[in-house]
A protein has these predicted regions:
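N-terminal leader/linker segments that initiate helical-solenoid repeat arrays
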Residues: 11, 17-66
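Canonical tetratricopeptide repeat
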Residues: 32, 66, 100, 132-135, ...
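Register position in tetratricopeptide repeats
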Residues: 39-40, 73-74, 104-108, 139-142, ...
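Structural marker of alpha-solenoid helical repeat scaffolds
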Residues: 56, 90, 123-124, 156, ...
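Residue-level recognition of tetratricopeptide repeat
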Residues: 60, 94, 126-129, 160, ...
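TPR alpha-solenoid repeat register
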Residues: 63, 97, 129-131, 163, ...
């Protein structure tokens, strides 16, 4: 799941640490203890302490999201779903709860559930709303829905506010769906590449893969070569170059690449 733990901790502390009653103090103590255990990767102890805090305050949206997030980390998706839904019962239309729940539903191919919760997103121009309609289109194999969602995403830079790797992987997966999906995906990838490529290797690889799939070989080669020149740890990029040259049957460049790789050993 793509939730930022550092942000969650800051928000959690600011919301949970309130009041001075003994019950509040006990809740805060258990929550902070749970956070500390989680940071040490002791997920079982973290969950135990979160649950103690939950027994004191069952209506805290941040705490409910933290418990759900931990259940996802433990691979217990049904339990996670339940806690995200509890958070939405307390605070309907909470975007963070909806975002995390919809991500989880998508991972499990739960289309009917996604259809239920997507309309609860208030801002119809938000990235979260358009992202989940795009994903629903993928699950339903609905080319029109995919195209319309990508058009909206590509026309608004909100998707750049937070790096979402799973979105770019999904984007690359629909490369061959239609000319329009290629057009809109290209716009999105170009913006993401400009924003993230200096500090994020993964966007370079995903974008290059996309370009190779749509047979934009020279453009793919260009971004891979730029990365290789500026970075030492670049074996993955060499592998992608090999894939590229193999697909376009460029025997001369393949031979040159083999020589470079032999010299790197």
């Amino acid at each position: 799941m793509a939730m930022n733990k550092k942000i969650a901790v800051v928000i959690g502390l600011s919301i949970l640490i309130s009041g001075c009653s003994s019950a509040n103090k006990e809740k805060n103590y258990n929550f902070i203890k749970g956070l500390n255990e989680y940071q040490k990767n002791d997920k079982v102890s973290a969950l135990e302490n979160y649950k103690k805090a939950y027994e004191i305050d069952k209506n805290n949206v941040v705490l409910l999201n933290e418990i759900a997030y931990l259940y996802v980390d433990l691979g217990k998706y049904e339990e996670a779903e339940n806690y995200y839904k509890k958070a939405l019962e307390v605070k309907p239309n909470d975007e963070n709860s909806l975002k995390n729940l919809l991500q989880l539903l998508y991972l499990q191919n739960k289309r009917t559930e996604m259809e239920k919760y997507i309309p609860m997103i208030i801002d119809r121009n938000s990235f979260v709303y358009n992202l989940n309609n795009f994903r629903l289109g993928i699950l339903e194999n609905d080319e029109d829905k995919v195209e319309k969602s990508l058009l909206k995403i590509s026309s608004n830079d909100k998707f750049l506010e937070e790096y979402n790797e799973s979105f770019y992987i999904d984007l690359a997966s629909v490369a061959g769906l239609s000319d329009n999906t290629i057009k809109y995906s290209n716009i999105i990838f170009e913006k993401a590449y400009r924003r993230y490529s200096n500090k994020n290797k993964d966007i370079v690889k995903i974008y290059a893969n996309f370009l190779i799939e749509i047979k934009e070989y020279r453009k793919a080669e260009d971004i891979l070569m730029k990365y290789i020149v500026n970075n030492e740890n670049n074996l993955d990029e060499y592998v992608l170059l090999k894939t590229l040259y193999t697909k376009e049957n460029n025997k001369q460049k393949l031979e040159n690449l083999k020589k470079i790789l032999r010299n790197k050993k």
